[in-house]
A protein has these predicted regions:
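Active-site-proximal alpha/beta segments of enzymes that process anionic O-linked groups
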Residues: 1-37, 42-203
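Active-site-proximal segments of metal-dependent phosphoesterases and phosphodiesterases across multiple
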Residues: 198-214
Length: 214
């Protein structure tokens, strides 16, 4: 089903994109700016000290931003589905749990950014091709630039931490308007492979708290 939907998305995308009209009322920024959207994986606010009375202070930086007028700590975010692919199909496109729109007939957040004049990037620490990732990969490949750490020959056979995605930001031209997606591996199993040992500060190896702290 996912492969079939992805193939249809690819077939219809150019037509859907061509028909999309975006008319911003005014420029969002007075000078070239970069917007970064981070997509996590298997993280829960119920286990983060920034949002709850978690046993361990595993998100101290985020918690320190409470009360800072330049940040919004949003407490009531919910996913529309409990599995990665159907959730992201709805998060990244106009498809949602309230309409009957098919994934392959939808425009995406990447499309809107492009039509708004942004250079678009997608950097991922997720897998490039698999049964689960294919629809997400189709959306990612519509960006002007799309890269997967798993496809880097220099990193083959090694665990790539999400922090490695920061090196990709060096490829983004700060003199342009940019929209950048960073797709994390996050807390996806096995947790023990998701953080450097320097962040192993709570309880025992492999605990969820250590990934959130990283």
């Amino acid at each position: 089903e996912y492969f079939e939907g992805a193939n249809k998305f690819k077939a219809y995308h150019d037509e859907n994109f061509a028909s999309l009209v975006v008319n911003p009322s005014k420029p969002a920024f007075s000078k070239p700016s970069t917007i970064i959207m981070v997509i996590g994986e298997s993280a829960s606010a119920y286990y983060m000290s920034a949002y709850s009375d978690a046993k361990n202070d595993n998100s101290p930086w985020l918690r320190s931003l409470r009360g800072n007028d330049n940040f919004i700590i949003f407490n009531h975010a919910y996913t529309s589905k409990c599995q990665t692919v159907p959730a992201l199909e709805r998060a990244l496109t106009e498809k949602n749990q309230y309409n009957d729109k098919e994934f392959n007939q939808c425009v995406t957040v990447i499309d809107i950014a492009k039509k708004s004049g942004y250079e678009t990037y997608w950097f991922s620490n997720q897998g490039y091709i698999s049964d689960a990732d294919t629809p997400i990969t189709m959306v990612a490949k519509t960006a002007d630039h799309a890269e997967w750490l798993s496809e880097d020959k220099a990193l083959k056979g090694k665990y790539q931490y999400d922090g490695d995605l920061l090196n990709c930001l060096k490829k983004v031209d700060p003199t342009k308007n940019n929209f950048v997606v960073l797709h994390f591996m996050g807390s996806h199993e096995d947790c023990i492979n998701r953080y450097p040992q320097s962040f192993a500060k709570f309880s025992e190896p492999g605990k969820f708290d250590m990934v959130l702290n990283y």
